[in-house]
C-alpha cells in the first residue's frame, strides 16, 4: 500500500486511469494514456479501451501513438498546430498515405 504521490509516473498514470474506470462513466476522456508506460502496460491500456468501446461507451482520446489510437478509433482527427488537417474513420486514416508518411514511419 502506497500513497499515489509516491508512485512512479507510469504507476500514477495507471492509478488515474483505474480510478476513472471505476466510476463506469458514459464518456471517458484520456489524454496520452500511454505516456510513460512500459510497452506491456500500453497493450493493456488499449485492451481496456477496446473493452470500453465494446460496451458502447464513448472515449475521447488524445494520443501521440497514432497507430494504436487509430486502430481502436471509430473516428479520428489529425491536428497540426491546433487545426484539423485530416479526418476520417480510424481505418481510413491508417490507410492514408499522408498519415503513414507523417505519423507512422512510412516513406512517402
Predicted regions mapped to residue ranges:
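Glycine-rich phosphate-binding loops of nucleotide-dependent enzymes
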Residues: 1-108
Amino acid at each position: 500500500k502506497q500513497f499515489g504521490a509516491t508512485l512512479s509516473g507510469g504507476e500514477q498514470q495507471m492509478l488515474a486511469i483505474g480510478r476513472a474506470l471505476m466510476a463506469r462513466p458514459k464518456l471517458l476522456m484520456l489524454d496520452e494514456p500511454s505516456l510513460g508506460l512500459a510497452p506491456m502496460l500500453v497493450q493493456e491500456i488499449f485492451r481496456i479501451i477496446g473493452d470500453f468501446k465494446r460496451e458502447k461507451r464513448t472515449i475521447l482520446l488524445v494520443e501521440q501513438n497514432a497507430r494504436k489510437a487509430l486502430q481502436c478509433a471509430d473516428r479520428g482527427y489529425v491536428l497540426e498546430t491546433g487545426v484539423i488537417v485530416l479526418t476520417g474513420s480510424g481505418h481510413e486514416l491508417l490507410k492514408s498515405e499522408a498519415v503513414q508518411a507523417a505519423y507512422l514511419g512510412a516513406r512517402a
